[in-house]
């Protein structure tokens, strides 16, 4: 909170953008971390390894985003069980049409809130694609899903497009029917 105003005044990325995720007092063991420059990906993975992180994706997209981009290939350095690997997620392989990252830029609070509501209501757009990609990554590193090739992204995009205002819709189809059966067995009671 003390360095924020100074960082903002500088107008560029600094070491503080990197220190935050590495110095979390929560000692998170599974996480997706975006970095502003590809050169920091491997050093980040090594630092997380030293901190006994179990599974992490360190991400940077070719269009400069510090998250998984629906518009360009995203470089990923994965730390899993002490081993570091690299791979690329290509949105074309996931059936995502090309677009422009500038379309994801926030504007004012009203506009940003409108886009969030659109995602909740199930509108299929670049915002929902971006959210689905990054949620899928989070579920992969959490151990709840295997990888992007097992339909993880498509399952989460489906869930978002169904409108997450419906509690059943946030469960990907691979688990959707199982949840419906359990719900019927419990006479509609939520446990």
Feature map (PLM): residue ranges:
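Glycine-rich anion-binding loops and their surrounding alpha/beta cores
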Residues: 1-173
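N-terminal low-complexity segments that are often proline-rich with Ser/Thr-Pro
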Residues: 169-191
